[in-house]
Swiss-Prot record:
Gene3D superfamilies for this protein: QueA-like (3.40.1780.10)
Lineage: Bacteria, Pseudomonadati, Pseudomonadota, Gammaproteobacteria, Vibrionales
One Pfam family this sequence matches: Queuosine_synth
UniProt keywords, alphabetically: Cytoplasm, Queuosine biosynthesis, S-adenosyl-L-methionine, Transferase
Assembly and oligomerization: Monomer.
Annotated organism of origin: Vibrio parahaemolyticus serotype O3:K6 (strain RIMD 2210633)
The protein's Enzyme Commission number: 2.4.99.17
Annotated protein name in UniProt: S-adenosylmethionine:tRNA ribosyltransferase-isomerase
Gene designation: queA
Localization (cell): Cytoplasm
GO process annotations (BP): queuosine biosynthetic process; tRNA wobble guanine modification
Metabolic or biological pathway, per its Swiss-Prot or TrEMBL entry: tRNA modification; tRNA-queuosine biosynthesis
Length: 350
């Protein structure tokens, strides 16, 4: 398939630049992957979709304030966007400036030149930086970093984003973009879902800035995914096995949860084993033709045209169903992308 097969026209006014006042106030487009049937509703309708015995899988990554502003020692302005933390003192980052810094040079970050870092090495488009401070990278980011809002939100970050560009169940710092399907859940809704008899499990995928990179090839088979770190621990494996044994469904909250679970499944297939814990980088690229191993239902926001994420959804719900749902969403003025509305999708099985 061609990347252009996943194009759709999106009016600029449908890009959500701010979240709704309440997390659960977003709209929910419900789709049956087998019939293509669409039902308009609100996000609290998730409660009607979840059944006793289901397992709802969340990504518990925490977004770090990964954007820093600063300068070179020579005075030129620069912007640093963390891709991932390498250890307590070092990061791998995108550096935007007029002329790329060379290994051995020092950069200064913070509004008042609070911290310095040495450019240790360059790895393709990314720079390895080591901070000259007794503080950890996380502490420095919490002090001077900005929330890394996606480029399409097209505004500076605000204090409210520190709370709203973060799930209520986040636990493990490391993401530079939010697992956005999870932004719609508040504690009240989570309690109601549990009260219905559903169980929860938590994977970790630290979303990287590469998630916003456009697909630069014409044929999707030629695309290579960026690497992201994943954890699928033993308790998640046990919960999945127990759910399947009792006839329950695996409901993935967000494409990052899907990619975590399916990475573990593919790892087991390669090894010829039962499902086992998975810790490490994944470059899994899911597009039409992929056979899902674990996930039965998907909660996900509306994604960018020609993105790998709309390809993932198309593999789950069927290409024609997906493009028709997006056409319906545009016509009915759903809000798109990170702060936008959501979908609940039952997997296409026929």
């Amino acid at each position: 398939m061609q990347v252009s097969d996943f194009h759709f026209d999106l009016p600029d006014e449908l890009i959500a630049r701010y979240p709704q006042p309440e997390r659960t106030a977003s709209r929910l487009l419900q789709m049956d992957g087998n019939t293509g049937e669409l039902i308009d509703g609100t996000f609290t309708d998730v409660l009607n979709q979840v059944q006793a015995g289901d397992l709802v899988v969340f990504n518990n990554t925490r977004v770090i304030p990964a954007r820093m502003f600063g300068r070179k020692e020579s005075g030129g302005k620069l912007e640093v966007l963390v891709e991932r933390m390498l250890d307590e003192k070092s990061i791998l980052a995108h550096v935007r400036c007029s002329k790329s810094p060379k290994p051995g040079t020092t950069i200064i970050v913070g509004e008042n030149d609070e911290y310095s870092a040495e450019m240790v090495a360059r790895h393709d488009a990314l720079f390895e930086l080591k901070f000259n401070s007794d503080k950890t990278v996380l502490d420095i980011l919490e002090e001077i970093g900005h929330m890394p809002l996606p480029p399409y939100i097209d505004r500076p970050d605000e204090d409210a984003d520190k709370e709203r560009y973060q799930t209520v169940y986040n636990q493990k710092p490391g993401a530079v973009a939010a697992p956005t399907a999870g932004l719609h859940f508040d504690d009240v809704l989570l309690d109601k879902i549990k009260a219905k008899g559903a169980e929860f499990a938590y994977v970790t995928l630290h979303v990287g800035a590469g998630t916003f990179q456009p697909v630069k090839v014409d044929n999707i088979n030629d695309h290579h995914m960026h690497a992201e770190y994943v954890e699928v621990p033993q308790e998640v494996v046990d919960a999945i096995n127990a759910t399947k044994a009792r006839g329950g469904r695996i409901i993935a909250v967000g494409t990052t949860s899907v990619r975590s679970l399916e990475s573990a499944a593919q790892d087991a297939l390669k090894k010829g084993t039962e499902l086992v814990p998975f810790f490490g980088d994944t470059e899994i690229f899911i597009y039409p033709g992929y056979e899902y191993q674990l996930v039965d239902c998907l909660i996900t926001n509306f994604h960018l045209p020609e993105s790998t994420l709309i390809m993932l959804v198309s593999a789950f719900a069927g290409y024609e169903n997906t493009m028709n749902a997006y056409k319906h969403a545009v016509e009915n003025k759903y809000r798109f992308f990170s702060y936008g509305d959501s979908m609940f999708i039952k997997k296409k099985t026929i």
